[in-house]
Curated annotation (Swiss-Prot):
It comes from Legionella pneumophila. ATP binds at residues 34-41. Its EC number is 7.6.2.5. Residues 2-200 form the ABC transporter domain. InterPro entries: AAA+_ATPase, ABC_transporter-like_ATP-bd, ABC_transptr_haem_export_CcmA, P-loop_NTPase. It is an enzyme of class 7 (translocase). The gene is ccmA. Keywords: ATP-binding, Cell inner membrane, Cell membrane, Cytochrome c-type biogenesis, Membrane, Nucleotide-binding, Translocase, Transport. It is a peripheral membrane protein. Belongs to the ABC transporter superfamily. CcmA exporter (TC 3.A.1.107) family. GO terms for molecular function: ABC-type heme transporter activity; ATP binding; ATP hydrolysis activity. This is Cytochrome c biogenesis ATP-binding export protein CcmA. SUPFAM superfamilies: P-loop containing nucleoside triphosphate hydrolases (SSF52540). It is found in: Cell inner membrane. One of its GO terms (biological process) is cytochrome complex assembly. The lineage of its organism: Bacteria, Pseudomonadati, Pseudomonadota, Gammaproteobacteria, Legionellales.
Length: 200
């Protein structure tokens, strides 16, 4: 599904990423690892088409993402380290913000029950805790029909039950042929044989 080929990226004229290459197949999960400042978030932004590399190529389904960036970006969902939640909109409004990209998506109330948030569905998100805001960002992810999930530290600020919920949803996405690329300082609660790791 996704091929990153000999990617280079400079930050302030200094090399940050060099010769990055990997393949992420449909149904695959790749855990990006590295110390703070290693370029994990930058690499996700490059793959999302938000930054341009100095060298190298990114292919999605064997086609350069540069060929039709807009169409490519409709097939991915990027949840950054920050939640990206509008504090002035309600939980429901935040989740439905991009609903035109995902016709036929599962109902918002049903998804809210996964995190026991249904009683907060019409609360402004500015009143939610950091963990709850993170959960709302993940609900938006699950409402999308994106094939490729790019997740930057998705396990941050989640309790154990929420962590197990997101792992289950990731596995369900993979079982349907989707692919997941994530960063995390935490070890994933999965068998090591069930996913790949890439160290920056």
């Amino acid at each position: 599904m996704l091929d990153v080929i000999e990617l280079d990226f400079d930050y302030h004229d200094q090399p940050l990423l060099q010769q990055i290459s990997f393949h992420l197949p449909a149904g695959g999960l790749l855990h990006l690892k590295g110390s703070n400042g290693a370029g994990k978030t930058t690499l996700l932004k490059l793959i999302a088409g938000l930054l341009n590399p100095e060298k190298g190529e990114i292919l999605f389904e064997r086609r350069s993402i540069k060929k039709d960036l807009c169409t490519y970006q409709k097939q991915l969902c990027f949840v950054g380290h920050r939640s990206g939640i509008n504090p002035y909109l309600t939980l429901r409004e935040n989740c439905l913000y991009d609903i035109h990209f995902s016709p036929g998506a599962v109902g918002i109330t049903e998804l809210c029950r996964l995190f026991s948030l249904e009683h907060l569905i019409d609360y402004p998100c500015g009143l939610l805790s950091s963990g709850q805001k993170r959960q709302v960002a993940l609900l938006r992810l699950w409402m999308s029909k994106a094939k490729l999930w790019l997740l930057d530290e998705p396990l941050v600020a989640l309790d154990e039950l929420s962590l197990l919920t997101i792992i289950r949803k990731i596995q369900e996405h993979r079982a349907k042929g989707g692919a997941v690329l994530l960063t995390s300082h935490q070890d994933l609660p999965l068998n090591k044989a069930d996913y790949e790791e890439y160290h920056l």
